[in-house]
Curated annotation (Swiss-Prot):
<dbReference type="GO" id="GO:0004056">
    <property type="term" value="F:argininosuccinate lyase activity"/>
</dbReference>
<dbReference type="Pfam" id="PF00206">
    <property type="entry name" value="Lyase_1"/>
</dbReference>
<dbReference type="InterPro" id="IPR020557">
    <property type="entry name" value="Fumarate_lyase_CS"/>
</dbReference>
<dbReference type="InterPro" id="IPR008948">
    <property type="entry name" value="L-Aspartase-like"/>
</dbReference>
<dbReference type="GO" id="GO:0006526">
    <property type="term" value="P:L-arginine biosynthetic process"/>
</dbReference>
<comment type="pathway">
    <text>Amino-acid biosynthesis; L-arginine biosynthesis; L-arginine from L-ornithine and carbamoyl phosphate: step 3/3.</text>
</comment>
<dbReference type="InterPro" id="IPR029419">
    <property type="entry name" value="Arg_succ_lyase_C"/>
</dbReference>
<dbReference type="GO" id="GO:0005829">
    <property type="term" value="C:cytosol"/>
</dbReference>
<keyword id="KW-0055">Arginine biosynthesis</keyword>
<dbReference type="GO" id="GO:0042450">
    <property type="term" value="P:arginine biosynthetic process via ornithine"/>
</dbReference>
<dbReference type="InterPro" id="IPR024083">
    <property type="entry name" value="Fumarase/histidase_N"/>
</dbReference>
<dbReference type="Pfam" id="PF14698">
    <property type="entry name" value="ASL_C2"/>
</dbReference>
<keyword id="KW-0456">Lyase</keyword>
<dbReference type="InterPro" id="IPR009049">
    <property type="entry name" value="Argininosuccinate_lyase"/>
</dbReference>
<dbReference type="InterPro" id="IPR022761">
    <property type="entry name" value="Fumarate_lyase_N"/>
</dbReference>
<comment type="similarity">
    <text>Belongs to the lyase 1 family. Argininosuccinate lyase subfamily.</text>
</comment>
<keyword id="KW-0963">Cytoplasm</keyword>
Amino acid sequence: MSSNNGDVRLWGARFADGPAEALAKLSASVHFDWRLAPYDIAGSRAHARVLSKAGLLSEDELTRMLAGLDQLEADVADGSFTGTIADEDVHTALERGLLERLGADLGGKLRAGRSRNDQIATLFRMYLRDHARTIGGLIADLQSALVGLAEAHADVAMPGRTHLQHAQPVLFAHHVLAHVQSLSRDAERLRQWDERTAVSPYGSGALAGSSLGLDPQAVAADLGFERGSVANSIDGTASRDFVAEFAFITAMIGVNLSRIAEEVIIWNTKEFSFVTLHDAFSTGSSIMPQKKNPDIAELARGKSGRLIGNLTGLLATLKALPLAYNRDLQEDKEPVFDSCDQLEVLLPAFTGMMATLTVNRERMEELAPAGFSLATDIAEWLVKQGVPFRVAHEVAGACVKECERAGIELDQLTDEQFAEISEHLTPEVRTVLNVRGALASRDGRGGTAPSAVAVQLAEVKEDLAAQHAWATARP
């Protein structure tokens, strides 16, 4: 099909001269907004139907219009029709394509009652709603991999840390499920965002609506916007908070991935040796033959900064725009397009890394009680004996001090040493000076006891089933 670049600009009748070449280059967006073409065509179909309903297209014209749009869609899909810089944007390129297929008399009727302002606000929502589900599904895949990791190592103890220092023993599964929870909130944010975004600006025109008797609600229903059309046409064309919110969610996903990545990088070092990465998800060095690098985790850290940058750049663009539409809003698309692209490449690789890593159980359990991490258990044992916690805390601290002086661990203190530290420290205190006992004692909701972690696993699996169902459904 011909891609003749005749001048079909959607503006210009009141200008004596065409745009300067420098302006045309600056103004062009078709090189990045062409990905919206399928949504633009879907919007055109819905618009053609309301034009017909309003008596502005005959039944025969509607039939031919829809056939022309079907042909244009097929030509876009197979690459035989593409936009060029001369088209300025995706809307103009597709209008050119429609005119080539239907002629100006019929093809030119589609412009009635719509503006690029309401078009782009609608198409952008449609695009992001689809990609929200794609990303949500990829998050669910990662969560499933993490759940599998937790289940396969359900009884492995490890040192829990605060300030990156030994704190208290926890189950490895408990630690992994903490990351699953943060990702669950990311997925929930996507679902809540989608619900808010399910309103269509189509029919808002440039800003004031249309006088042609068109039905915005019919277009909204046709395009899968469950909440109908926007309540205010100015807001519909001018607001991009839905874009900023989406950019925040993707940035938050990046931050949460980066936190997991940082731990994987640390755990994979010789000094920690908590995990070993699979060869298929590691890289080597061009000069050091022994190297096995955690590149996926490092790229996740780097890309999180990129996602944050996309958000901050977008907010800076939006911060001072008066109502209604301003051309600044051309700059709203590339940041979030990039955020989608980055996550849709990163998440599968990250999931593969987590699903295939080897957990070094012996090393984790060796270090679980290290660093006097059972000191809190001594304090809590004393509390159960009726000792005020302030006193119990001081006594446990004195035990740590004595161990540091003697170069031993807490469970190596003798009965005599315990008695010298405090009269409350009877030999029975030894019942809590073991990792398994410390873990089992923390059996409240959300705790690290095996029984509590089993409940967390069951709840996460239930949530994941709902998340997968949402991700595979399309509006």
